Amino acid sequence: MSQSKADYINVIGAGLAGSEAAYQIAKRGIPVKLYEMRGVKATPQHKTTNFAELVCSNSFRGDSLTNAVGLLKEEMRRLDSIIMRNGEAHRVPAGGAMAVDREGYAEAVTAEIESHPLIEVIRKEITEIPDDAITVIASGPLTSDALAEKIHELNGGDGFYFYDAAAPIVDKATIDMNKVYLKSRYDKGEAAYLNCPMTKEEFMAFYEALTTAEEAPLNSFEKEKYFEGCMPIEVMAKRGIKTMLYGPMKPVGLEYPEDYMGPRDGDFKTPYAVVQLRQDNAAGSLYNIVGFQTHLKWGEQKRVFQMIPGLENAEFVRYGVMHRNSYMDSPNLLKQTFQSKSNPNLFFAGQMTGVEGYVESAASGLVAGINAARLFKGEDEVIFPHTTAIGSLPYYVTHAESKHFQPMNVNFGIIKELEGPRIRDKKERYEKIAERALKDLQTFIDA
């Protein structure tokens, strides 16, 4: 155990992880200096200066406890996550998923943090790793070059990276509603998605256009390394037609409504392929194209995506873009507390640690913030149970094989297995894992 003599803790970056870390520290009665460069220096992806901005999708993904990210969200709610609380307050319809009005949510997080009496917000770019106090670095995958260089020095000069992309957003008023229908897959939850059905002929023409469209160039010295969970649609398409039909354009569970009058293949009750649109703001005026992260040139996006039935005259309020994400060699550099092995006063959180996804990033900030606060108070740091979703993430990123380490979403495969004979039914098995996780988390909280 080591601790600083300073009477505050630094948090660098006010994204999901940094906002969560700052809140967790401050609620434990410790002053925080929260540094955020947006407002002074922009990033390629962020559109506002709000904290915890969502730059890719507006979805926090599945809400069911039989979904690992649903379990993680419930654990975070029980740990008083500022991200989850404000996300809940700004939900928009998304069937069985949790999606938010991205502007209202980010504005609420920003207002709560800026008004907190123990959090001092400093709009400034940090170019060196501070040594004046316990510090949580949560500068994100878009960390500025100067600070990224210092972090890479901790990596022994090695920088890991991958690319991910954001999906386009369209103005609902410009969608041809006669060609689409409202439905959630398998009718789960409320009918929350606009579905753009395709016949086989329409799909094949779209597929041909997508796979031959011109992509925006990458730097010539960088390989195209993508995170599977946010892969550009054109890259996915080049893997083959079935990748699309079993992936983002899967038609199963999205049968035509009885009053559907558009084109279809014969008497089939289900389209050959479906493109889904998900509500992106509380007003319901914007919709994003689900799973259509892309790196196509903007003119090509307009040409190809207007081939989607219902989007022939759609106005794109934001085109899809791709950005480079950097992450650390966490298995060699970090403890399960998200603490540096070489400097106990230094913590890291967010996607740079190798957790992937909004919820996972916020969860890492929660863990790092709690442990930074405990270190400040002279208490032992805590390791969350491996039987929980929030404990499985730091376990994974610090125990993975360094040579093949890549960012990871939360999933039941990284949570400690149940004891006893394996339960064959997947839903029942996941229910038991979730039940054990919440029980163990409560025991951990009460200890």
UniProtKB/Swiss-Prot annotation:
Which GO cellular component term is one of those annotated? Answer: cytosol
Q: Where in the cell is it found?
A: Cytoplasm
GO terms, biological process: tRNA methylation; tRNA wobble uridine modification
Q: Which PROSITE patterns match?
A: GIDA_2
E.C. code? 2.1.1.74
Please provide the record's keywords in A-Z order: Cytoplasm, FAD, Flavoprotein, Methyltransferase, NAD, NADP, Transferase, tRNA processing
Q: Which InterPro entries match?
A: FAD/NAD-bd_sf, MnmG-rel, MnmG-rel_CS, MnmG_N, TrmFO
Q: What is its main location?
A: cytoplasm
The cofactors named for this UniProt entry are: FAD
- What reaction does this catalyse? uridine(54) in tRNA + (6R)-5,10-methylene-5,6,7,8-tetrahydrofolate + NADH + H(+) = 5-methyluridine(54) in tRNA + (6S)-5,6,7,8-tetrahydrofolate + NAD(+); uridine(54) in tRNA + (6R)-5,10-methylene-5,6,7,8-tetrahydrofolate + NADPH + H(+) = 5-methyluridine(54) in tRNA + (6S)-5,6,7,8-tetrahydrofolate + NADP(+)
**Keyword ATP-binding attributed:** no
Please explain the role this protein plays, according to its UniProt record.
Catalyzes the folate-dependent formation of 5-methyl-uridine at position 54 (M-5-U54) in all tRNAs.
Q: Which family does it belong to?
A: Belongs to the MnmG family. TrmFO subfamily.
What's the protein called, per UniProt? Methylenetetrahydrofolate--tRNA-(uracil-5-)-methyltransferase TrmFO
In its UniProt entry, the species of origin is given as: Streptococcus thermophilus (strain ATCC BAA-491 / LMD-9)
